[in-house]
């Protein structure tokens, strides 16, 4: 197996709202990584690209949409996403490409533009929850993070103040990172005083939503050695996914991280990680998550090692176990897919002596980066190492400042040309017989489970297979008691989109272990009829159902769980075996649903020039000095050579008259509804330029327009639907 090294890195600034399009952000990071590696795009054999949920951009298969900016045009190309775990999964995929011997070099790119999504980027996470059993409760990631944080605190005895120390350290470390979005000198008191979102989570416990991109170049040993500098090797990789049924396990310990770490350690020859690793970059979207993930990386289910290190100050940049010297997601920012790759880049800087003011104390020869994603289930881990004495390289990166990095921060998308999109997507999700049986239980005022004899588990929600017993078929179903015990809870002040609830209103979400189903077989739902101050882990509760004539066979037929009264504790009811529902065309159920997200897309650096020209009735392109061509429409990068371009400084005027080279007559809108009149959509090419422009053709002629000479129609409207042409003459 070929050894694989990181030989170059690039990144944009991480910002709340970027003017650049996703492709422009990716191209900026790629150009920097190629320059750092001393290579051109022609030297790259393959490209791996990571972006997280498509719901952030509202563009299906978003990776393919920005392939040009990622340098993947006409190259072997792979796109993948596992939520926040993507940024470490991406270099793992790139490592596979090179380690296999098939490729000598691989460009790894991770990009995320979260800002287009409204009413808030966090609202996009509604799409990762089960559409039938969880989305109706209007959960968001803040809620399940808060549930996990509360369980973590309960299991390991942490206080909120102790956890807040992580946020303080990481934000301070970020003061020295050129890409950092929110570097700050704050105190534990500042964290504790910040706005409460969903107890125990406060504003300063959380990383920001971000736009940004990161790229690295991977190379075989032969290519890396030929560069004449000490390589930084990928020594071990690991990746594991746990079940999406996140209420079926104790949230206190990240088993998926520990398993991935064990795989990486075995590959790297590590037997004592606490002694053999010099730099730690765990994923830290919330401050408690850094400690949570460190428990997994140290393979310590007791949590004593991490607590001891925290109390000793070992996680400081000058400590014995420096954690997130970069500043992590909490300080640098969290453009979901790109965050993990930022951590990989940090290890490259640290282990090659290029980290500048962020360089950890002592010689660092080995580091570990880890990322996490989706429903608290993804673990991705990479171990990296250098060889020989630590080289201190006075590179560009050693002295880089924020103003040296690309990435244009906006106060508002409305400040630049942009396009609004309201998809209004609707769905009908089929249930199948197991889920139908489960939901019919709600209609009957019952909590139902399926039983696996292989592992002796009552499974909630009921399912036709066991995910831990080799997909063993399950055909036994039970009605369970509608009582249980609170395993963890959160008192929320925000809704599904992370927007404030009405004044005085809170929602209390809890994971309830249902009686008869085991300690860690929980059901997430609301609590009611209880003072928030009286809620605690271990609280005994009972379901409160809607009146029978109002039930619809949905999880919301259970209104909430209330505290169980002492006089109701007269012996636990036993599970009762039932027959599963037999499906027919009449009884087969489905769940209607809608994804309530809207988008506002910036036109980008190239688009800003294009729409300014359009308003004046003119057309310009962008000159690429490397390829010696004019690109149309205006562009911030050249798709062929990945050279960064300035659409303003390198603008070249073009004749606004062009020739139609392709056309189609459209009779329906994008939703399939008939148009009042058919519309010609044409592709137009222009003399002395590479590329073309799509738009409407305004004409009364029904003849096919291919070969027709047309000109741009001036308009001040922004958006592809406003680009139009008319015949010349």
Language-model regions, residue ranges each:
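Condensing-enzyme catalytic core mediating Claisen C-C bond formation in acyl metabolism
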Residues: 1-23, 27, 32, 132, ...
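Conserved active-site "lid/cap" helical segment
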Residues: 1-85, 93, 152-159, 181-187, ...
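Active-site-proximal alpha-helical scaffold in enzymes
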Residues: 81-112, 142-176, 216-222, 335-356
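Glycine-rich active-site loops that engage anionic ligands at enzyme catalytic sites
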Residues: 483-529, 537, 657-698, 706
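Well-ordered alpha/beta subsegment
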Residues: 516-572, 687-729
């Amino acid at each position: 197996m070929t050894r694989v090294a990181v030989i170059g890195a690039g990144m944009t600034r991480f910002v709340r709202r970027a003017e650049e399009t996703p492709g422009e952000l990716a191209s900026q990071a790629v150009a920097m990584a190629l320059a750092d590696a001393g290579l051109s795009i022609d030297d790259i054999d393959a490209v791996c690209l990571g972006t997280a949920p498509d719901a952030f951009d509202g563009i299906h298969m978003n990776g393919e949409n920005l392939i040009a900016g990622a340098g993947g045009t006409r190259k072997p190309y792979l796109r993948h996403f596992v939520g926040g775990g993507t940024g470490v999964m991406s270099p793992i995929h790139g490592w596979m490409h090179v380690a296999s011997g098939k490729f000598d070099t691989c460009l790894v790119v991770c990009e995320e533009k979260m800002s287009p999504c409204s009413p808030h980027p966090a609202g996009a996470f509604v799409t990762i929850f089960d559409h039938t059993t969880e989305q109706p409760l209007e959960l968001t990631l803040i809620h399940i993070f808060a549930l996990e944080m509360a369980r973590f605190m309960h299991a390991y005895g942490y206080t909120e103040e102790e956890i807040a120390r992580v946020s303080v350290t990481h934000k301070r470390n970020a003061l020295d990172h050129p890409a950092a979005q929110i570097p700050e000198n704050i105190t534990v008191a500042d964290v504790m005083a910040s706005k409460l979102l969903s107890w125990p989570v406060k504003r300063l416990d959380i990383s920001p939503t971000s736009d940004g991109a990161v790229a690295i170049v991977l190379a075989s040993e032969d290519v890396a050695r030929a560069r004449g500098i000490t390589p930084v090797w990928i020594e071990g990789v690991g990746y594991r996914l746990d079940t999406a049924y996140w209420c079926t396990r104790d949230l206190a310990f990240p088993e998926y991280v520990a398993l991935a770490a064990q795989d990486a350690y075995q590959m790297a020859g590590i037997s004592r990680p606490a002694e053999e690793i010099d730099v730690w970059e765990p994923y830290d979207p919330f401050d408690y998550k850094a400690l949570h993930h460190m428990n997994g990386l140290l393979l310590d289910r007791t949590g004593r090692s991490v607590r001891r290190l925290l109390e000793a100050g070992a996680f400081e940049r000058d400590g014995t176990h420096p954690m997130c010297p970069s500043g992590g997601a909490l300080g640098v920012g969290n453009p979901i897919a790109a965050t993990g790759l930022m951590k990989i880049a940090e290890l490259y800087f640290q282990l090659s002596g290029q980290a500048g003011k962020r360089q950890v104390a002592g010689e660092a020869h080995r580091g570990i980066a880890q990322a996490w994603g989706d429903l608290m289930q993804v673990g991705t881990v990479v171990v990296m190492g250098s060889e020989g004495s630590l080289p201190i390289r006075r590179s560009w990166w050693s002295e880089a400042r924020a103003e040296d990095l690309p990435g244009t921060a906006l106060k508002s998308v409305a400040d630049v040309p942009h396009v609004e999109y309201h998809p209004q997507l609707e769905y009908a999700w089929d249930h199948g017989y197991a889920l139908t049986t489960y939901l019919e239980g709600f209609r009957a005022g019952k909590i139902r489970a399926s039983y696996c004899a292989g592992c002796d588990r009552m499974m909630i929600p009921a399912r036709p297979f066991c995910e831990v017993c080799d997909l063993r078929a399950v055909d036994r179903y039970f009605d369970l008691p509608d009582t249980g015990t609170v395993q963890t809870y959160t008192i929320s002040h925000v809704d599904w989109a992370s927007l404030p609830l009405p004044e005085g209103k809170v929602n209390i979400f809890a994971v309830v272990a249902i009686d008869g189903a085991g300690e860690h077989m929980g059901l997430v739902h609301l609590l009611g009829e209880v003072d928030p101050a009286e809620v605690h882990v271990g609280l005994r509760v009972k379901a409160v159902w809607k009146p029978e004539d109002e039930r619809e066979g949905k999880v919301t037929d259970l209104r909430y769980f209330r505290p169980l009264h002492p006089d109701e504790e007269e012996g636990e009811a036993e599970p009762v075996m039932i027959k599963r529902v037999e499906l027919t065309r009449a009884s087969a159920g489905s769940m209607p649903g809608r994804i309530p997200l809207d988008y506002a897309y910036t036109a980008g650096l190239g688009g800003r020039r294009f729409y300014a020209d359009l308003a004046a009735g003119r057309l310009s392109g962008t000159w690429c000095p490397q390829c010696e061509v004019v690109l149309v429409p205006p562009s911030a990068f050249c798709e062929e050579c990945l050279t960064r371009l300035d659409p303003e400084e390198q603008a070249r005027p073009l004749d606004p008259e062009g020739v139609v080279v392709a056309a189609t007559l459209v009779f329906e809108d994008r939703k399939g509804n008939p148009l009042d009149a058919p519309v010609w959509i044409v592709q137009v090419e222009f003399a002395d330029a590479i590329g073309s422009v799509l738009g409407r053709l305004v004409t009364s002629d029904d003849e096919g327009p291919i070969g027709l000479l047309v000109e741009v129609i001036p308009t001040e409207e922004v958006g592809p639907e406003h680009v139009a042409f008319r015949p010349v003459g």
